[in-house]
Every structure is written in C-alpha cells, then in structure tokens.
C-alpha cells in the first residue's frame, strides 16, 4: 500500500504545511526523473543486448533500441518509478517536518528551511544509487528476455549473481546453481524491492553467418 503523506498534513500546523508545500515533489520533478530513468533504462537495455550477442558468439554486435513498443514499456516503468519515488519522498519529508516540530515547537521559517536543507541531501545520497541500480537491472532483465525470445536462441544455462543474498527467494536460486536458460528467462531478476541480482548467462553459440541476422533492438 502506498505511503500516504496527505494523511500527515493533518497533523501539521500552518508553518509546517507551508514548509511541506515548498519542498515536496510534484509533476515537474516527477517528469524530470522519468526522463532520467528512461535514459538509464535505455542505455542498460542496449548494453545488455550487446552482452548477450557476445554470449551467443557474436561479439561486436551493438544493441540499438528503435522498437517503439519496448521503448513504451521502459517509459511506463520509469513513469511508475518516478511517481512512487516522489510519493515516498513526500511522505518522509512530512515525517521529518513533524520530527523537527517535536524538537523545536517554536521553530520558524528559517528553522524549518535549515532542517530540510540538511536532511534532503542525506536522503538522496543513499536513495539515488538505489534508484539507478533498480532501473538498470530491470532493463537488463527485460533485454535478456527479449533477446532470447525474439532470436529464438534460448539454449544454455544461467546463474544468479552476485552469489550472496539475504532474501529467501534469491538464496534459493543461488543454491540451485546453474539452471536451464529457459527457466532463468521465465524468472527474471528483481525478486524483491531493491534486489541486486541478475542472471549471468552462458548460451549456445549461433553460427557465425547468423550473427548479422540477430535482432538487436529494432
């Protein structure tokens, strides 16, 4: 269930609500983040296509995403993420404002401005790398599925990497070791929020003369 920052506004005084209004994310920030995430996803998707081309013996083939349907899916994922990230920030912004009010009930505009100016960079310092990692790994997992589905070359095996985990699902996959490639592609990464895992694939090579025919994002 999404965090409800609007519910916290009812606990604020006028000064705190004004502070939240001034600092919270809205459509413009969300749209900027959507564009950034789409760029991250697109680059990761294209790079993964190149990696998988190398895995089937066609090193040097570069991914170039021109498929509108796939680009649309990457954009939808980026838009969902941007809205979720915005909502989460606005919630914890409200929590921080209420905490600041408990610390200094008589705090004025300058007090709240300084408090949020100190808090926000710390929040984003750990959040942004996490956001980028999720965008990259989900795009790579999608590229793996599309590459082998469209090229019809899903023969081989895969292991989940990195080989350390705390999530029971990830631990289970790691314990299984190498699994058939088709099984891996049917169970793409991102098994839980902020999952760092992705399949490392060993695939059967295609004939050299077929390398120019590989689908690489068109």
For each feature predicted by the language model, list its residue ranges:
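N-terminal leader/targeting and assembly helices and adjacent pre-domain segments
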Residues: 1-139, 151-152, 203-218
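Acidic, glycine-rich two-metal-ion catalytic cores of nucleic acid-processing enzymes
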Residues: 119-211, 215
